[in-house]
Amino acid sequence: MESVLGRGSMGTVWAATDEVLHRPVAIKQVNVPPGLSAGEVARLRERTMREARAVAALCSPYVVTVFDVLTPDAGPVIVMELFRGRSLADVIRDVGRLTDGQAATVGVAVASALRAAHAAGITHRDVKPANVLIGVDGGIKLTDFGVARSSAEPTITGTGMILGSAAYLAPEVATGTPVGPLSDAWSLGGLLFACVEGRPPFDRGTPIATVASVVKDPVPAHPHAGRLGRVISGLLLKTPSLRMRLDRALPIMRTVADDPSGTHLTTSPENPSSRPDHPDRLHA
């Protein structure tokens, strides 16, 4: 291992070199929080192994590749692709709003990654701008498939645990309905909303207030959505059975992204995603 890329409440990431294949990699060690019972530790290891193996089986250019996973006593270790760029959250923070063409380019990548995951029986559960990487070459990757999430970023999972980001939480998840692909579709709608409006659709300052708003409040207007307006509106329908599905949203987004007026989205090499902008944001 060569250098520490970032430390967070759930683990540490290093840059390293695979000495067999001579390629750069990122290595994440998932911490075992103190105070857990033996059963809780076993479940943490089992969940990490199961999800890391599932992500490793995905064949998508839009997913950060997992090469290997190990289980030493100190905590699970995940060997993964080293992808240089910035998070979409940081791009939005710096530029304010993306064009509809740029947002559609992101949407195509994220939706494609989600379709590959859903086909493999995986639901992401935490789609948000902080979990999307924009590469220095314009490549886009979806990260954090539940391998290691920080409890400092609240979301409600199907088990009732609070993990992730409430601002992009599907309303049915907040009310206890099991998580599924349509929940990821809602979160993609929230992500696209943030791209074109510069803020999430629901954010009331605290996780509890935000979750209540997701469940009860109407979806805010999105006047800057442009040609993505019907996609965002369709993905953010609160009734899952009425919500736009990814296979319907993708062709629309491709048309918008392929339009010459859509600016190619890149990030500067001075801000590599391998060095997290936030200590708790560990890309994997």
Question: At which residue positions do the language-model features occur?
Answer:
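C-terminal or otherwise distal, non-catalytic regulatory regions appended to signaling enzyme catalytic cores
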Residues: 273-284
